[in-house]
Amino acid sequence: MMTAKAVDKIPVTLSGFVHQLSDNIYPVEDLAATSVTIFPNAELGGPFDQMNGVAGDGMINIDMTGEKRSLDLPYPSSFAPVSAPRNQTFTYMGKFSIDPQYPGASCYPEGIINIVSAGILQGVTSPASTTASSSVTSASPNPLATGPLGVCTMSQTQPDLDHLYSPPPPPPPYSGCAGDLYQDPSAFLSAATTSTSSSLAYPPPPSYPSPKPATDPGLFPMIPDYPGFFPSQCQRDLHGTAGPDRKPFPCPLDTLRVPPPLTPLSTIRNFTLGGPSAGVTGPGASGGSEGPRLPGSSSAAAAAAAAAAYNPHHLPLRPILRPRKYPNRPSKTPVHERPYPCPAEGCDRRFSRSDELTRHIRIHTGHKPFQCRICMRNFSRSDHLTTHIRTHTGEKPFACDYCGRKFARSDERKRHTKIHLRQKERKSSAPSASVPAPSTASCSGGVQPGGTLCSSNSSSLGGGPLAPCSSRTRTP
């Protein structure tokens, strides 16, 4: 093996590197003193005079002429020496390799350029038992192939040569999660060092194993479904293993209070028209129209459940917030005719009918079983609900007998009728002689400031109909 001097590392390719070298970069005088012998007992001479050219694919053809002196190559006894005339050309094949600077320990600490001599051939194949041939043989399966003219060719392909002159990929990060992806680089370094020291050949490029497929459960386990993250109890709630009717948030229904039923429209219609209204009355009722009615249910069990749920005796009795205006006023009905006293403490009311007592007890309990279907407002009495519904419908069934004005409530019509009656009394009490002459400027068919009527209305006092309400003023 012949080793050249250490030179500066030039980042060029093989062919470019050969063209840049001058002819006298390694003179014979310096090479004889520092190089080692290629073959045993061979004299170092000067046949290395010039380089004729570079063959393709990284092949270096060096024509060795015997201008200065002959080269005697004694071979071992097992091989016959080949005579080499002075005027015959020798062909050499060599390989240049520039070792990059590895970040760690390198198997080439000196960083030199190695020239591996494959052999000297002259028409026949050189001995394969030499150290250089054996080292190249151990490095590649088919190291050399000799052509008809004695030119040695390399068996390695161009990608292998490109890998030798290109820096290797950076080492992968060795972390806990990447331990399965890449192997320890010390195994490659130790193998390369052993191969170099034993066979003096370049180690094969380290081949990193490809990453494991993503389907490997050791690397990235595929989650089959989300229930793997949840405990068994949550899985049952998510997937509904208890059945399709399972509620996500179950809660006891006995703790909730059932809202009061709506008053049927038939009850409201019957009450408005003055007909009998059927309904479920409270305890002790004698068939009155008070009490809630079941919406759309006629079974006895539902009626009993509703009656028990809305039983006034089950609710606490509270004192009346607004006391009576005349609490000590004697009733017109004798006491023995009012057998239903109020059970609330501090209330001395007595009633002659049980439905009246039931309606009164709702004042203490706050029970309002009648609900408006339009605004969902609750009422304690059905007549209050009926009157309230008329505010939504605009119905005014009560008309005034004197002026024809309509009202939604009978008490409103009664209050309005009193106005006409007071006016009639004033007309009858005023003497006809004391009526002064009316003034057309101030009289508009109404009542004058003195309280007398206009002359236009005096003719109608004798039993005729009263004037419209718009032409009269309200008097206290």
Curated annotation (Swiss-Prot):
PROSITE patterns the record matches: ZINC_FINGER_C2H2_1, ZINC_FINGER_C2H2_2
Effect of I268N: In CHN1; loss of large and small myelinated nerve fibers
EC number(s) reported in the record: 2.3.2.-
N6-acetyllysine sites (modified residues): K247
Annotated Gly residues bias: 281-290
Keyword Membrane: no
Family classification: Belongs to the EGR C2H2-type zinc-finger protein family.
PANTHER family membership: E3 SUMO-PROTEIN LIGASE EGR2, KRUEPPEL-LIKE TRANSCRIPTION FACTOR
Protein name per the record: E3 SUMO-protein ligase EGR2
Source organism of this protein record: Homo sapiens (Human)
